[in-house]
UniProtKB/Swiss-Prot annotation:
NCBIfam families reported in the protein's UniProt record: PRK00024.1, radc
CDD domains: MPN_DUF2466
Record-listed Zn(2+) binding positions: H173, H175, D186
Pfam families the UniProt entry points to: RadC, UPF0758_N
Top-level taxonomic group: Bacteria
Gene Ontology molecular function: metal ion binding; metallopeptidase activity
Protein name: UPF0758 protein Nmul_A2138
Limits of the MPN domain: 102-224
Chain span(s) of sequence motif JAMM motif: 173-186
Length: 224
């Protein structure tokens, strides 16, 4: 049955307009994005299939074009639309960080990092460069690694910090395993970066580890 044949109160778009987006399930929100289903499946049915295949929204957002387009009814145009929505959300969060003290805004920082890193299949190391008032100057993905590790070079991090004339930096990387727990190597790397940047008067404010559904702060754990 097509969604247009459903009772008006049960249609995702009408429910959102009446009650707000928080009232809808993940499948209903995704169905509004999809707009239409395929033969024999409503947009909600198709949304549920996508969420099941990719193990939720996080997996769906991290899916590459090849995997996404293997789902019947999904093609390059829909993939591009999804990526555009994600990028707009990421940029909106980055705008918020640029206009406020990042250390006074832990919520937006975490949200930005989760949107940028959670669900990625390989480790990615990100640096957020800040000015003297802890406002974001730039965010850069500096290194990419394998499923279990990333090679990070302090010299390159220092060069990028000097390029941006940064006064401070926040680091982040993801754990594809899903566990937001620091390894011994993570702790050693953080201290190495801190010492290297200290030589050029750049402060390391925090290092976040992004796992599945969780983000750990080195500063909050007393590890910086």
């Amino acid at each position: 049955m097509s969604i247009s044949d459903w009772p008006e109160a049960e249609r995702p778009r009408e429910k959102l307009l009446k009650n707000g987006p928080a009232y809808l399930s993940d499948a209903e929100l995704l169905a509004i994005f999809l707009r239409t289903g395929i033969a024999g499946k409503s947009a909600v049915d198709l949304a549920r299939e996508l969420l099941k295949r990719f193990r939720g929204l996080t997996g769906l957002f991290a899916a590459d074009q090849g995997a996404f387009c293997q789902v019947p009814g999904m093609g390059p145009a829909k993939f591009a639309q999804l990526q555009a929505v994600l990028e707009m959300a990421r940029r909106a969060l980055e705008e918020e960080l640029k206009s406020s003290d990042a250390m006074d805004s832990p919520g937006p920082v975490r949200a930005f990092l989760r949107l940028s890193l959670e669900g990625k299949e390989h480790e990615v190391f990100v640096s957020i460069f800040l000015d003297a008032r802890n406002r974001v100057i730039a965010t850069e993905e500096l290194f990419q690694g394998t499923l279990t590790q990333t090679s990070v070079y302090p010299r390159e991090v220092v060069k990028r910090a000097l390029h941006h004339n940064a006064a401070a930096v926040i680091f982040a990387h993801n754990h594809p395993s899903g566990a937001a727990e620091p390894s011994h190597a993570d702790a050693v790397l953080t201290q190495s970066l801190k010492q290297a940047l200290l030589l050029v008067d750049v402060r390391v404010l925090d290092h976040f580890i992004v796992g599945r559904g969780a983000t750990l702060s080195f500063a909050e754990q007393g590890l910086i």
